[in-house]
């Protein structure tokens, strides 16, 4: 989900990042839909190497489509998944790798959000079901009354009718789309079949390698994709010009695409803003979101040109800082800062503060996923000076929104009332119209039910204010009710009738206890509380008045006045720790499976005033097992997705963990306009307490249930006669289309055309998907059945696949060998962006930085003394390839190899000793000595001519992976290492794999110093 509004914000600010998808129309033959595209034909959208499918983004709309009837069975839902996935594949047509990633167990930081969504979903479903039941009963009652039938009593007939409604099959529970459920097991089996079916029937798939990471593999789908991309970049034979595409709906995929630092990257998604204009069941159109063009916009928008700025502009690190700034506006793991909202222009405000900070700072805020906390503190300190102004503006905007909604609702209610009066032939006097307060309580003796409150809250609270007379009457009757000793009615609308107390903020607190209080309850007699008549939302904090910090923590965190100062710093430190966790998650993978932010609300920007010296450390931890996550995120109403042995723990009153499964819970609008944005105030789970009771039930599980609770690795499926299979035969894993070796085989990207990693025959217990025959696994009607394939005709083969583990920390840089295309933005468009920046800041710019003719002068200004100088061709800021020869032969632009490397000479977290580069202390550079990647002298594995040709030239020519003296050149980012000395190819990959490998796997003098 990420940042609501981010896609719209970027598509409006950077319009060229969005482009239409060319999609061939399908045809109907004998009632069957035939794709109009030929997968083997050239792709009209441009050729693509690797496609990554975040499968949850496909499964959800296929199982419970918006505005349409859901398929009647799970098996037919999976057929819809096949159909939709094929549509995506025919648009993208990847030629090398397809990765299908399903959400596995998530980090604890994400589980809290999943828990809130699933509890809210179950509650809404229950309310909807109750509303439907009552509506049908009411209709039946009217029918019987009008028919005047005799025989059974009206009460008896209605009881029988109600029982029939209760016994009707319920709506499919979308909470089944969670790891560990029978549905997810069925989904994985179905995808394995479908991939095998396509390999057997689609000629264009013959050389495609398909990696499936199902729900038994830990991690969120999009982050498993990120791990895969990082692992391939780390392979020494990786092609830096590989093109990538992710299909998915979440806005945070934009951040993930940027964080790869793979410029040939785009996203495929549905055009959600055009879908309402499509009639009936027409397919929603696809659009591309082009990350490479977004990088062009960011290059112009983020460039700092203040004359006091001494830091060289580096697009890659500027992008990382921009991603960091956006985390305060929203992400999947932390609540956004109160003053940060995309729709209010918060990203622009933060960027301006960042540019101002660059005049004071010595470096960027982030470095390869690590945060400079002192500079982060300085940034937020200056942002805090604008916080109150932004919050007041948000409040004014919300009030205007409420007024417009009130007018709209009043008109709609008046229309409904008029229609009802005509139908019933009755006249309703205003004096007899029941009036309700915002809690749903009648001023008289009528009390709304929970269902009526939630289902009709807008109609009730807004229609009562349809005209001034009604409003006056409401105020009078509310006051009269208060005077007679009735319970104070002017409390904000809430979803429960008997609210529970918010639990302790500690992540390992004791189980929560009940508390009759509720956030933001309002008292009309309190002059210090503002109550909005249209929604009943009580503004206790009142950001427009002084002292709002204390009120914020006292009302949102239930702190006492003398506790506020310590609490706000505690919350700020935990929040910043969370931001660091998220950044590391994006750039290096999950740093802790157990950490989570233990509060429902974010701190204020002014509270980050003592974070510069805080320690950010995460202890080792392991992911939950699937049933442990299910017990953490599912409400009791969805307990049918779990084995029967666990269900009493969720529903029985004497369960030791029953407090984790409340049926009623608080919703806090927290100043938001729409109810779906409300904060869901659920108790945080004590992991040790939960796991103690869940794991005690493991001995009662059946073998099938235990199997669903097992964690596994990815698999790769490929064609028996394709190029990948031929590579496996050359390496001895296969013979004549049959797997003959049980030993793991390590493969690099070059020999497999883009799929580095370790493959091996699956364990016997896990080999159901790799049997020679391929059987259609779904139970559907005959006309929907797909073919099965006997062993002698099945061309699909399956191996266990292990993603390579990086031996070094991922770096935020373009890889050597990348050839940038011509700019998409014209000179005029780039100038317009710069003019917009000048107008926003009112400052002067060095026009030399934007010269479109003197590229050499521009590069000298941007690159001198920075690690960009060592990347040469990989620079996005360079002219088209035909004009780049001047850089190769210019020793000045090659950089000061002794002193100018990547963060050398005491930069961010560095040690000055010995010119060692990023966090290195000796001369050896990044993890290596003089001998290249993990080698002392011999290179990647040969004694011959070198992967790049020419004896001793190494992988990239010159003397190593990055040319010159290493990955970054000289003593910097590579020191004499990561490509230095003899280079990634050293004596040469081409000289015979494994031949003359002299260096072993230890490296030389440098050593890995983190």
Swiss-Prot record:
GO MF terms on file?
5'-3' RNA exonuclease activity; RNA binding; rRNA binding
Q: Which InterPro entries match?
A: 5_3_exoribonuclease, Xrn1_helical, Xrn1_N, Xrn2/3/4
Compartments annotated for it: namely: Nucleus
Q: What is its main location?
A: nucleus
CC terms in the record's Gene Ontology section: Las1 complex; nucleus; RNA polymerase II termination complex
Where along the chain is composition biased (Basic residues)?
A: 998-1010
Q: Which residue ranges have biased composition labelled Basic and acidic residues? A: 488-503
Q: What is its EC number?
A: 3.1.13.-
Compositionally biased region (Polar residues):
504-530
Cite the residue spans of the region called Disordered. Answer: 402-437, 481-530, 754-781, 879-923, 990-1010
What Gene3D superfamilies does this protein map onto?
1.25.40.1050, 3.40.50.12390
Q: Which GO terms describe its biological process?
A: cleavage in ITS2 between 5.8S rRNA and LSU-rRNA of tricistronic rRNA transcript (SSU-rRNA, 5.8S rRNA, LSU-rRNA); mRNA splicing, via spliceosome; NAD-cap decapping; negative regulation of transcription elongation by RNA polymerase II; nuclear mRNA surveillance; nuclear polyadenylation-dependent rRNA catabolic process; nuclear-transcribed mRNA catabolic process; positive regulation of termination of RNA polymerase II transcription
UniProtKB keywords:
Exonuclease, Hydrolase, mRNA processing, Nuclease, Nucleus, rRNA processing, Transcription, Transcription regulation, Transcription termination
Membership in a protein family: Belongs to the 5'-3' exonuclease family. XRN2/RAT1 subfamily.
Q: Quaternary structure?
A: Interacts with RAI1; the interaction is direct, stabilizes RAT1 protein structure and may stimulate its exoribonuclease activity. The interaction also stimulates RAI1 pyrophosphohydrolase activity, probably by recruiting it to mRNA substrates.
- Purpose of the protein: Possesses 5'->3' exoribonuclease activity. Required for the processing of nuclear mRNA and rRNA precursors. May promote the termination of transcription by RNA polymerase II. Essential for vegetative cell growth and chromosome segregation.
What is the designated name of this protein? 5'-3' exoribonuclease 2
The species this protein was found in: Yarrowia lipolytica (strain CLIB 122 / E 150)
